[in-house]
Amino acid sequence: TDPYSPTVRIKEFKQMVQALHRAGIRVILDVVYNHTFDIKNSNFQRVNPDYYYRKTADGKYSDGSGCGNETASEKALMREYMLESVKYWVNEYHIDGFRFDLMGVHDIVTMNDIRAAVDQIDPSIYIYGEGWSAGSCAYPTDKLAMKANTRQLNGIGAFCDDMRDALRGPFSDDHKGGFLAGMPDMEESLKFGIVGAISHPQIDMMRVNYSKEAWTNSPTQMVSYVSCHDDLCLTARLRSSIPGITEDELIRLDLLAQTAVLTSQGVPFILCGEEMLRDKKGVHNSFKSPDSINHLDWNNLKRYPQVFDYYSGLIALRKSHPAFRLANADLVRKHLSFLDAPKGVVAF
């Protein structure tokens, strides 16, 4: 191997994808089209100054990405760049799906064009993303691929922060808990996630934490999760929001959280390593942290075999029973009903 040789890196990446496919594992690529590292030295700016970036009414560069700029996906050449590069990843590297970073910065038309383009190659390719931005965008919100506009996206999913924060607590405050911490009035938000963010007669949308109306056409458009690479991992969030929590309590609440995720009608998403109680030492955003923080401690498999076995059992349960994978909203409304339960309990 030679990390300084581009041809070697390309070859090894292809070999990696091929090996994963042989093992029955599909590969999803995290793509970040919403910003560049800077503007002045970017290839976009050198080729066509200011064309590829959005600007505010007063001529300043807009910063919907929170990284100093935002790209203008609605412009023909930026749209073509996104389309052609996605198709290249599929055709040349055999990528099976794409996770769009800050998808809410991109316009709806471009995202639907990407979906249509990959459908021509392989309709099973899964596309989803973060249905939000990191700041105000210099483009009409109703034309952006925000979570609230997911019903305008064809076959594209979005992360469900409604369910995430109902379980663990709000994004804005690591020390505040949610359903797992026994906080009141989280039931409707959790139920909304369980049905896949569709409209359901047993859910009072006015009591859902963020969304006041359904935002998916199909449960497959909702990604159900409780933590990801951003923010605190689940173990750290539980420690932060529940002072004095014991290890036994932490494990039980961790398993409860993933029970909600893996029995919901959305597409379940689990942060790598959480099946063995991954711990990033309380680092909130570890993208620039060393391996001592981001590594996977495989010794945890020996420390917490019961956690790994429980996760495995949940996955096996989901795969074995179609009731957890209903194909459309009508089937969910027909077959999934919530039972009467006391406050602090959700049963279905």
Describe the role of every protein-language-model region.
Residues 31-41, 102-107, 130-134, 269-280, ...:
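Short, solvent-exposed turn/loop segments enriched in Gly/Ser/Thr/Pro and often Arg
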Residues 297, 301-331:
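Catalytic cores of secreted or luminal carbohydrate-active enzymes
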Residues 20, 30, 89, 100, ...:
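Conserved, mostly hydrophobic/aromatic
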Residues 73, 99-102, 212-213, 238-252, ...:
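Active-site rim elements
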Residues 115-116, 124-272, 276-277, 287, ...:
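Conserved alpha/beta catalytic core and glycan-binding cleft of carbohydrate-active enzymes
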Residues 17, 86-90, 115, 119, ...:
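Non-transmembrane alpha-helical segments in soluble domains
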Residues 1-93, 106-122, 126, 137-138:
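Substrate-binding/active-site clefts of carbohydrate-active enzymes
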Residues 287-296:
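Acyl/amide activation-and-transfer machinery of modular secondary-metabolite enzymes
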